[in-house]
């Protein structure tokens, strides 16, 4: 049976992550409060950020920026700003 969490991003009960994907206290917070669906949404945004901003995951500043964006997206309800990106409309 799947583990469920009260997802802070989706604001509903949903299937939780199978295991802690991110290290440390933030990783525990994500594991306890973020659903698989919300994590998948974040991963898509993360990929776009890395590509559009040409982030280097070996660079500490780039990793810190990405972590800040992740917290803003998952816990504070802030949309990720990606220059030039226009979301596709449902009727397209």
Curated annotation (Swiss-Prot):
Q: Is-annotated flag, keyword Iron?
A: yes
| The protein, known as | Probable Fe(2+)-trafficking protein
Which Gene Ontology cellular component annotation is one that this UniProt entry carries? cytosol
Q: Which family does it belong to?
A: Belongs to the Fe(2+)-trafficking protein family.
Q: What does this protein do?
A: Could be a mediator in iron transactions between iron acquisition and iron-requiring processes, such as synthesis and/or repair of Fe-S clusters in biosynthetic enzymes.
Q: Name one GO molecular function term.
A: iron ion binding
Q: Which UniProt keywords apply?
A: Iron
Cite a single Pfam family from the UniProt record: Iron_traffic
Q: Name one GO biological process term.
A: cellular response to oxidative stress
Query: Which NCBIfam families does its entry note?
Result: PRK05408.1 (NF003817)
């Amino acid at each position: 049976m799947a583990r469920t969490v009260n997802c802070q991003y989706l604001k509903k009960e949903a299937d939780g992550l199978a295991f802690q994907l991110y290290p440390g206290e933030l990783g525990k917070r994500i594991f306890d409060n973020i659903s698989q669906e919300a994590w998948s949404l974040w991963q898509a945004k993360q990929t776009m950020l890395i590509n559009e901003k040409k982030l280097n995951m070996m660079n500490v500043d780039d990793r810190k920026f990405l972590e800040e964006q992740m917290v803003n997206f998952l816990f504070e309800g802030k949309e990720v700003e990606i220059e030039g990106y226009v979301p596709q409309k449902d009727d397209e």
